């Protein structure tokens, strides 16, 4: 019976995962040469690239190339970009998605026989990894705006609690019936279970 099936299911409750991101804070100039020789054709891909903040934290990356004189043939540009594209899925710091990176391929070299798309993609991935670590990387934590309405007598306790939760109080506005609205920015990770805590701290009178 259906009821028997339900009885055998284990239910695991866990906090939702917070969407952390990784980004960089300064410019980094790197060179990476991917070279392998093992009988027959080898592998060769050589890139010189800069990585810097793009200023757009809603977009993983922006890719540009300014190669002159055919140092890296045009047909390898997509492979270099693919290397960047694959790199931003899991960042070098803690495997969180990467945002806000501008990658520019400006030079490099190739081998008429040994170069391949795979070699240039690998070179770009290694260049990304090396540059990211040098470019003052940081983990971004989502911040949300919070509005709490509590009886005036509880404002001190609530503000102390918000500070403990790494919140930044932006303002306090008196409302009707002896209550105060506290407006704050607070890390999303600190908000799980907050409404329950708020009710217990205010005897059910905070919202």
Positions of the model-derived regions?
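Accessory interaction regions appended to the cores of large information-processing enzymes
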Residues: 1-207
């Amino acid at each position: 019976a259906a009821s028997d099936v339900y009885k055998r299911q284990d239910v695991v409750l866990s906090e939702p995962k917070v969407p952390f991101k990784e980004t960089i804070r300064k410019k980094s100039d790197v060179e990476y040469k991917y070279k392998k020789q093992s009988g027959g054709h080898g592998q060769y891909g050589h890139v010189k690239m800069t990585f810097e903040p793009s200023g757009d934290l809603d977009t993983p990356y922006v890719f540009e190339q300014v190669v002159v004189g055919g140092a890296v043939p045009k047909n390898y540009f997509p492979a270099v970009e693919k290397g960047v594209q694959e790199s931003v899925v899991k960042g070098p710091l803690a495997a969180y998605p990467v945002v806000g990176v501008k990658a520019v391929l400006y030079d490099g070299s190739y081998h008429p026989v040994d170069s391949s798309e795979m070699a240039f993609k690998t070179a770009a991935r290694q260049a990304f990894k090396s540059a990211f670590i040098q470019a003052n990387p940081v983990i971004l934590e989502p911040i949300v705006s919070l509005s709490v309405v509590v009886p005036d007598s509880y404002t001190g306790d609530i503000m102390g609690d918000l500070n403990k939760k790494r919140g930044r109080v932006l303002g306090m506005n008196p409302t009707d019936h002896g209550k105060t609205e506290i407006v704050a920015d607070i890390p999303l990770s600190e908000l799980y279970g907050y409404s329950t805590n708020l009710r217990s701290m205010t005897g059910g009178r905070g919202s």
